[in-house]
Regions:
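Soluble accessory domains appended to multi-pass membrane transport proteins
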Residues: 2-108
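Membrane-proximal, solvent-exposed terminal domains/tails of membrane-associated proteins
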Residues: 73-83, 88-167
């Protein structure tokens, strides 16, 4: 009953029979592939059963952001972001945390690099996270995150990591 793939032998489907001499796989085009059992031990194959039982397929994609486009958010930018339904609560909550931190640590706000500030990259990451969490096609019971990876020569990768709701 497991779904296996062995491209080398043309198998991509459900195991329907296992005997001492053969393993029969019903491919998704309804053809039958017969494989000697020793190949399952001596060669590599992919068993998709864990993915089927997990409740969804894992999706892992990156979006590269041009490093030169990242900047601190101005009050005008934050006002625009607050108008976006998926961002309003995040911007309000984060701005409160930033202001409290800067006040508590007596930060001189006249210099932008002092203290904490929101960036357009951080706000975009929050937007992507909230967007994924709003989709019915994303499994909300399993991990769903957007994280920033190490910068590369092509930019700053934002990795989207989640599981689909359909197997």
């Amino acid at each position: 009953g497991d779904w296996i793939t062995m491209p080398k032998y043309g198998a991509d489907g459900t195991v329907i029979e296992v005997t001492l001499n053969t393993v029969k796989v019903r491919n998704f085009d309804n053809t039958i592939t017969t494989i000697p059992p020793y190949l399952l031990v001596s060669d590599s194959f992919q068993n998709w059963q864990g993915m089927q039982e997990s409740g969804g397929r894992r999706v892992k994609r990156s979006i590269n952001i041009d490093m030169s486009s990242v900047r601190f958010c101005t009050p005008e930018m934050l006002a625009k972001y607050r108008k976006i339904q998926l961002l309003k609560d995040y911007v309000d909550r984060t701005e409160k945390v930033v202001e409290e931190y800067n006040k508590e640590h007596n930060i001189d706000n006249s210099v932008l690099v002092n203290g904490r500030r929101q960036t357009n990259l951080g706000v975009f990451r929050a937007y992507l996270t909230n967007y994924l969490k709003s989709l019915p096609t994303v499994n909300q019971e399993l991990t769903c995150m957007v994280r920033q990876l190490q910068p590369t020569e092509t930019g700053i990768p934002l990795e989207l990591y989640f599981f689909s709701a359909n197997k």
